[in-house]
């Protein structure tokens, strides 16, 4: 183990293989086998031939060593976690196999959490879970197309891949409502509103009502301009918890109405653009309001995300909703009646994209420059 820690993986593999031939207590023999497994998979990670049969055999061995201790106090569980995290997941990440990376992370989360633990519902609406769960983080980092591929991957048999079979047997979470909601939300974030509709319509309202974002969804409206006022909700983020507000019952899924609204408005805008219609600036203002509200900076961030960190920004694979709002505001400002609001909105958007509305990021000189 000293050789492995010092970075000499080949020496660690050789010494641990020799140690496995020696006599000792059960724990000593298991230690030698665990170190050999760790070193061998590290070599595979670095380019040695990948032996899936060997990996599955060793993972099954670790699984068989049940103890009465919880995961973090169980030596064999920690070996399992370390090998999978450091070597197996790293191997698949190196080979850009996002499906196996996500599946393996899901397997580890499944092992760490008791079956009856509330957190195991994998509800992305619980921000505390989204913040600390690597499985959700992996899924959340995928594009919509990548997530769709992963959903297909989860339901395949993988007859020719024993490791994929093993991992997916350990990671059995397949709730269609969860994955359809996640996929539909990603499609919205990419600006693919028409594609998102049939996916989101598969999600029962009862499921949406159980998400942590339901409270916020019930009390915010994406049609109200963010640059005029903030729609406050009495939840744990705004002045404590209001128990009465927590017991909300959604009448409809706002993600669906948003997609319908955006699809209709964008079609009308394109027609007005072709005909050089006078309604174009007004339609542009309506689209700007909606795009900004649904961005990670707006009050209705829950339409495209499951949490709102104070330092969030548009992700590389998402459509830049704030920038799209600016594009529409540039059209709206050409109308005399809308010019004042459009110019004010542009200054507001530019400032908040820089600071995300955080007081500690406020720079008065920069603000003055933006207003010029």
Residue ranges, per PLM feature:
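Extracytoplasmic/secretory-pathway proteins
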Residues: 1-372
């Amino acid at each position: 183990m000293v050789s492995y820690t010092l970075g000499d993986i080949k020496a660690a593999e050789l010494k641990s293989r020799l140690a496995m031939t020696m006599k000792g207590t059960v724990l000593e023999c298991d230690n030698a086998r665990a170190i050999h497994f760790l070193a061998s998979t590290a070599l595979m990670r670095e380019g040695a031939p990948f032996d899936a049969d060997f990996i599955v055999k060793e993972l099954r061995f670790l699984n068989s060593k049940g103890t009465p201790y919880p995961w973090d106090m169980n030596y064999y569980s920690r070996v399992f976690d370390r090998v999978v995290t450091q070597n197996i997941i790293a191997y698949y990440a190196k080979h850009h196999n996002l499906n196996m990376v996500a599946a393996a992370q899901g397997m580890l989360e499944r092992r760490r959490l008791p079956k009856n633990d509330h957190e195991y519902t994998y509800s992305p609406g619980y921000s505390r879970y989204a913040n600390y769960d690597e499985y959700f983080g992996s899924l959340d980092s995928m594009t919509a197309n990548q997530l769709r591929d992963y959903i297909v991957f989860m339901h395949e048999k993988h007859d020719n891949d024993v490791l994929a079979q093993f991992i997916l047997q350990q990671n059995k979470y397949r709730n269609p409502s969860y994955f359809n909601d996640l996929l539909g939300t990603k499609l919205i974030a990419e600006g693919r509103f028409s594609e998102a509709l049939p996916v989101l319509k598969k999600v029962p309202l009862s499921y949406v009502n159980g998400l942590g974002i339901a409270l916020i969804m019930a009390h915010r409206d994406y049609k109200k301009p963010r640059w005029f006022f903030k729609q406050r909700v009495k939840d744990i983020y705004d002045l404590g918890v209001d128990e009465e507000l927590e017991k909300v019952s959604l009448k409809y899924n706002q993600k669906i109405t948003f997609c319908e609204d955006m699809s209709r408005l964008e079609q009308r805008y394109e027609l007005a653009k072709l005909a050089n219609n006078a309604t174009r600036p007004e339609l542009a203002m309506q689209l700007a309001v909606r795009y900004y509200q649904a961005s990670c900076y707006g009050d209705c961030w829950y339409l495209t995300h499951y949490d709102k960190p104070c330092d969030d920004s548009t992700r590389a694979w998402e459509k830049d909703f704030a920038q799209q709002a600016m594009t529409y505001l540039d059209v709206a400002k050409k109308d005399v009646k809308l010019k004042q609001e459009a110019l004010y909105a542009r200054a507001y958007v530019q400032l908040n994209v820089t600071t995300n509305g955080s007081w500690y990021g406020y720079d008065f000189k920069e603000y003055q420059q933006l207003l010029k």
